[in-house]
């Protein structure tokens, strides 16, 4: 997963719900150095009787926001969805640098 272009990440999930695996794998895929330096990471744990829905929200360097439901996607689907936009930013960056 291309995480270079993430500036903010918000993850909300129930650790015992069906969305937990996708959310935990997503959080593990972010490099520790990036978490410490360039990306603001916020997470919120839900209880079993919480009314809030699980959510993964990513803000990219160009201020584009993507909100995804971890309960409805596998980690592979989630990462390919985010990579699609990251590749667009990477291409744009490569064109501008030439």
From Swiss-Prot:
One of its GO terms (molecular function) is structural constituent of ribosome. Keywords: Mitochondrion, Ribonucleoprotein, Ribosomal protein. It holds the Pfam family MRP_L53. It comes from the Eukaryota. One of its GO terms (cellular component) is mitochondrial large ribosomal subunit. It is found in: Mitochondrion. PANTHER family: 54S RIBOSOMAL PROTEIN L44, MITOCHONDRIAL, LARGE RIBOSOMAL SUBUNIT PROTEIN ML53. Belongs to the mitochondrion-specific ribosomal protein mL53 family. Component of the large subunit of mitochondrial ribosome. This is Large ribosomal subunit protein mL53.
